[in-house]
């Protein structure tokens, strides 16, 4: 519903967040949003900024938004080519109580706590599952330096 999105937009205009910048791609279309999230501290994504593309369905908040990474990122739960995110919150665990901001916070949390058992990026997932966390973190840091700034 546009009213719900307008309410979220007004809240965002009145508050400033250090780790999330969230705004409509075009103020005349509240169904397309952009988010810039900062990589969480003490992770390979620290100091990176990552752009997300957010498409909001017309029956939002009853249905979740579709969110994809625009910025390339090396993470087991993010598809390397499409930017698709494997996060239950965006699929089966969605509830109308969530906002675009709270979903972005969940994505930041996913960067801190990857789920290697349900990978969209099998290479990243396999590194973690096989105990090569240093290898995973090294590649994730390299991608963050190359693309996340």
From Swiss-Prot:
<keyword id="KW-0067">ATP-binding</keyword>
<protein>
    <recommendedName>
        <fullName>Ubiquitin-conjugating enzyme E2 pex4</fullName>
        <ecNumber>2.3.2.23</ecNumber>
    </recommendedName>
</protein>
<dbReference type="InterPro" id="IPR000608">
    <property type="entry name" value="UBQ-conjugat_E2_core"/>
</dbReference>
<keyword id="KW-0547">Nucleotide-binding</keyword>
<dbReference type="GO" id="GO:0000209">
    <property type="term" value="P:protein polyubiquitination"/>
</dbReference>
<dbReference type="Pfam" id="PF00179">
    <property type="entry name" value="UQ_con"/>
</dbReference>
<keyword id="KW-0833">Ubl conjugation pathway</keyword>
<dbReference type="InterPro" id="IPR023313">
    <property type="entry name" value="UBQ-conjugating_AS"/>
</dbReference>
<comment type="function">
    <text>Catalyzes the covalent attachment of ubiquitin to other proteins. Essential for peroxisome biogenesis.</text>
</comment>
<dbReference type="GO" id="GO:0005524">
    <property type="term" value="F:ATP binding"/>
</dbReference>
<comment type="pathway">
    <text>Protein modification; protein ubiquitination.</text>
</comment>
<dbReference type="GO" id="GO:0061631">
    <property type="term" value="F:ubiquitin conjugating enzyme activity"/>
</dbReference>
<feature type="domain" description="UBC core">
    <location>
        <begin position="1"/>
        <end position="149"/>
    </location>
</feature>
<dbReference type="InterPro" id="IPR050113">
    <property type="entry name" value="Ub_conjugating_enzyme"/>
</dbReference>
<dbReference type="GO" id="GO:0007031">
    <property type="term" value="P:peroxisome organization"/>
</dbReference>
<dbReference type="InterPro" id="IPR016135">
    <property type="entry name" value="UBQ-conjugating_enzyme/RWD"/>
</dbReference>
<feature type="active site" description="Glycyl thioester intermediate">
    <location>
        <position position="86"/>
    </location>
</feature>
<dbReference type="GO" id="GO:0016558">
    <property type="term" value="P:protein import into peroxisome matrix"/>
</dbReference>
<dbReference type="GO" id="GO:0005777">
    <property type="term" value="C:peroxisome"/>
</dbReference>
<dbReference type="GO" id="GO:0005634">
    <property type="term" value="C:nucleus"/>
</dbReference>
<keyword id="KW-0962">Peroxisome biogenesis</keyword>
<comment type="similarity">
    <text>Belongs to the ubiquitin-conjugating enzyme family.</text>
</comment>
<keyword id="KW-0808">Transferase</keyword>
